[in-house]
């Protein structure tokens, strides 16, 4: 199978590929697309060459086989929830963490493993392939420990007997993230759980998580940070506007180092509200300078006028069909038994913003350069332009999903989440070969 692509050659990818077993046609396809993407990301981020080889081999043998059949049309046979609403159903997306002044960029990927039982009545929640992959990681990656995950996971499973109810709730319930730092010899694994039953989400803070944490850490576990989130969301005038999504992330590492991430959303888009959540109602101070940086970035990525008062909501956005595009703002709270207060991270959804993907990316890079944060942020632009044609970045949406923002050591720590758009672009660019129409990926 040949590939016709506009992506720039990455020598280390070509060298690694030269001696790899070809695998089946599906694996060849996903490796030549996503393997090249990963190689470009690591090259631009300045990973040591031996680390690039190590991570590429991990990707080829421990990620690619889980991506399922190659596309045969622009409609996915199973629409993965990786990448959220911006994505096209592809079972993988990527992130680029820009780093801070003393930490260089590093990359991650997020996948929903697909297996023989995916999209069948035998596995309506698509759990089998994911759990098998996590078990494999625990056998092959010395740093991976699944004690917390195996303890938490049963608490998130729906207890449903009626077939009709299960059919209504079928869909993704687990995702996996793999973080590959340039300065490490390990690959850090994260699992993300999605309760499918609405009543489970409402019980998350009061029943499910307290019991899961006691089961994992012992009856005397300190729940201060979890209880703080519950109190903040029920008693604080800003916090009570938050809504639980049910999504929960957990580190697959030694129990004492495991973090539990609880995801929430708000529909209040005023910057004063965003700042109140980031500071936990003033309990976690952030300097006025950093709040000013966050405000400027928030307005620019959302296409809001700079003079908009911080107490005002963002202008309502209109879709091409003239319907209203509701804006939600996701956050997560990072819960750890040893912490009294949770850490907070905000997510800026650019997939629904009036700002083009390229303009959003340029805005973030300019911000980092202006404030001396991150290391070589323009390398990120090289990655985006290599994965997605510049014209598409200028005129279409969907390549970029979110930017996340946290505060680390008096700097904004920014991460970009973006999509390969394998299905969306499958027939977008076609070439003639021997009189036949073929995708650029073939």
From Swiss-Prot:
Top enzyme class: transferase
Pfam (any one): Trp_DMAT
Pathway in which the depicted protein is active: Secondary metabolite biosynthesis
EC number(s) on file: 2.5.1.-
GO BP annotation list: alkaloid metabolic process
GO function terms (MF aspect): prenyltransferase activity
InterPro entries in the record: Aro_prenylTrfase (IPR033964), Aro_prenylTrfase_DMATS (IPR017795)
Purpose: Prenyltransferase; part of the gene cluster that mediates the biosynthesis of neosartoricin B, a prenylated anthracenone that probably exhibits T-cell antiproliferative activity, suggestive of a physiological role as an immunosuppressive agent. The non-reducing polyketide synthase nscA probably synthesizes and cyclizes the decaketide backbone. The hydrolase nscB then mediates the product release through hydrolysis followed by spontaneous decarboxylation. The prenyltransferase nscD catalyzes the addition of the dimethylallyl group to the aromatic C5.
Classification via PANTHER family: INDOLE PRENYLTRANSFERASE TDIB-RELATED, PRENYLTRANSFERASE ASQH1-RELATED
Family designation: Belongs to the tryptophan dimethylallyltransferase family.
Protein's name in the database: Prenyltransferase nscD
